[in-house]
Structures are given as C-alpha cells and as structure tokens.
C-alpha cells in the first residue's frame, strides 16, 4: 500500500497520473463529457477517461491538473477470492492494452505533455511489456538450469537480493 501511495504521489507531483482508482476519482463533469465520457466497452474506464480528458485538454491548449490526495478515506470492496482476483487483474491487463492501443497517437508527442512523453511510454514498458519480459526470462532461466549453465551460488544471491529489496 505504501509503494502504491508513493507512486501515486510521484505521478501527481509531475501531473502525469495514469489512472485513479474507480471509487476514489472525482472529475470535472464538463471536461469528462466534452472528452466523451465513460467508454462502455472499456476494460479500464478510469485510465481511458483520464487519457481522453488529458488529450482533450491538450488538443485545446487548456491547463489541467490531475491530483492524488493521499489523506482521503473511502471504502471499496476487493476481490473475495483468487478466481475473482485473477479475473480483475486480467481485465486490467486487457484494459491497459486497450487504452494504449486507442491512444497510441499520443505516445511520444510533445503536444500531450507528461501523458504523451512519460506516462504512456512508462505504462507500455513497465506495465505492459514487463510481465512478458519476466516470463521470457523465467523460461530462459529454466532452460539454462536444465542445461547446467547456471552458477547456483550466484543465482541464489541475486534472487535473495532482488526479492529482499524490490
């Protein structure tokens, strides 16, 4: 929870917040409607709406601010079991891909400020590609382990360091 809040505060400080948690978001209604409102088929409504709102504000050269307020208190319901958690996380992953695909024209465009130059590229590399890279790394590691190419003393020290500090 601490890393989540610190991450949100960092994104807020640079006005590059990628999303807000569903039940915790407050939006300027007129901007949300002008940007197209909620997209019903979206799997990540909050990220999609924020990205569209930022796109709208930048297209019309209007100032905007996306702020995380860390001391808000609101109750929300989490997944009650592992099956529901799995469905929630796969829906979020599909939503991330969907949002990145829909708004790909914003990526690396100076017009879209932090969202185009930092937030969307970050989301692509560290949220979308990272699990794929990690899976490939695991497969390669298993292959190397079976072929005897792993120095186990070094491998255990690396894993211990990674999982202790990351």
Spell out what each predicted region is.
Residues 64-84:
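Active-site donor/metal-binding and catalytic loop motifs
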Residues 31-34, 42-67:
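A short, conserved alpha-helix in the catalytic core of glycosyltransferases
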Residues 1-42, 55, 90-97, 101:
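Long helical/loop segments within the catalytic core of UDP-sugar-dependent glycosyltransferases
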Residues 29, 50, 135-139:
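Alpha-helical transmembrane segments of polytopic integral membrane proteins
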Residues 14-15, 79-166:
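Basic/Trp-rich segment in TM-proximal cytosolic loops or flexible interdomain/linker regions
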Residues 24, 45-48, 52-53, 121, ...:
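Catalytic core and acceptor-binding pocket of nucleotide-sugar-dependent glycosyltransferases
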Residues 27, 44, 48, 80-84:
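Charged, alpha-helix-enriched surfaces in structured cytosolic catalytic cores
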């Amino acid at each position: 929870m601490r890393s989540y809040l610190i991450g949100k505060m960092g994104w807020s400080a640079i006005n590059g917040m990628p999303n807000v948690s569903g039940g915790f978001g407050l939006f300027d209604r007129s901007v949300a409607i002008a940007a197209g409102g909620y997209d019903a088929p979206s799997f990540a409504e909050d990220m999609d709406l924020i990205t569209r709102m930022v796109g709208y504000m930048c297209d019309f050269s209007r100032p905007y601010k996306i702020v995380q307020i860390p001391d808000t208190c609101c109750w929300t319901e989490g997944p009650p079991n592992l099956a529901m958690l799995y469905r929630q996380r796969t829906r979020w992953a599909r939503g991330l891909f969907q949002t990145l695909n829909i708004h790909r024209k914003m990526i690396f465009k100076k017009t879209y400020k932090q969202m185009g130059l930092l937030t969307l590229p970050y989301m692509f590399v560290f949220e979308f590609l990272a699990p794929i890279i990690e899976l490939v790394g695991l497969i390669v590691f298993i292959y190397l382990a079976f072929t005897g190419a792993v120095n186990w003393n070094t491998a255990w020290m690396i894993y211990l360091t990674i999982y202790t500090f990351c």
